Amino acid sequence: MSMQPELKVQRTPPKGGFHAWHREHGVGEISHRILVWTIYLNDIPQGEGETEFLEYGMKVQPKKGTVCFFPAGFTHTHRGNAVYTHDKYIATGWYYLA
């Protein structure tokens, strides 16, 4: 396993988010991803900006300093729910099967 050398930092403005259900493992350049990590860089009010997992009905509320690890495959299809009142900041990356 190896860690992606780049750190991806994202800003999500109010009403933004990655609303489509997706997974981090697929074809092409993402085909070797096996584990995802996300660090929440700021607090977001309850009910906004959660990382939601389809199969589990589970939502992770963004709280500054919290790290979320999950498998990249179909078992953890997820989305980023909209934020309404604040910008949301995350750092994210992947572990690859090299």
Task: Mark where each language-model region is.
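Extracellular/lumenal carbohydrate-interaction signature centered on repeated Trp-anchored short motifs
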Residues: 1, 28-30, 61
